[in-house]
Curated annotation (Swiss-Prot):
Organism in which the protein naturally occurs: Shigella boydii serotype 18 (strain CDC 3083-94 / BS512)
Family of this protein: Belongs to the purine/pyrimidine phosphoribosyltransferase family. XGPT subfamily.
Gene that encodes it: gpt
Protein name, UniProt field: Xanthine-guanine phosphoribosyltransferase
PANTHER family membership: XANTHINE PHOSPHORIBOSYLTRANSFERASE, XANTHINE-GUANINE PHOSPHORIBOSYLTRANSFERASE
Cofactor(s) the protein requires to work: Mg(2+)
């Protein structure tokens, strides 16, 4: 990945609220299935904005910090996804998205961010990201002091 896209907590909340507004009315949904781990925080934000209390997870491992590797399903929610929103932070190459589509063919699959290769696999997303860009999510970063360039 040649570029980095830094996401702040404020940006994430703004994007999640925009996505939530597109998912109204909230009564049409039985619940939310958050893809662990990237979809956990966006899932909580959607649950809050939509007033949804039924939140489950599907646990799929495909990244080891910044290296993509083989998919491994650790836990899945019951059913075919009918009436559920499945949320992840990002659709990248589409590997996880294909697995999600197979597991929950009737779910409404959404992400906050989408790269070109995975975009056709989601029902909705908020932000376009170039394929060669790495996203730094706020839960993966800490706030640190940065000294002035002048050194004074």
């Amino acid at each position: 990945m040649s570029e980095k896209y830094i996401v702040t907590w404020d940006m994430l909340q703004i994007h999640a609220r925009k996505l939530a507004s597109r998912l109204m009315p909230s009564e049409q949904w039985k619940g939310i299935i958050a893809v662990s781990r990237g979809g956990l925080v966006p899932g909580a934000l959607l649950a809050r904005e939509l007033g949804i209390r039924h939140v489950d997870t599907v646990c799929i491992s495909s990244y080891d910090h910044d290296n993509q590797r083989e998919l491994k399903v650790l836990k899945c929610a019951e059913g075919d996804g009918e009436g559920f929103i499945v949320i992840d932070d990002l659709v990248d190459t589409g590997g996880t998205a294909v697995a999600i589509r197979e597991m929950y063919p009737k779910a409404h699959f959404v992400t906050i961010f989408a790269k070109p290769a995975g975009r056709p696999l989601v029902d909705d997303y908020v932000v376009d990201i170039p394929q060669d860009t790495w996203i730094e999510q706020p839960w993966d970063m800490g706030v640190v002091f940065v000294p002035p360039i002048s050194g004074r």
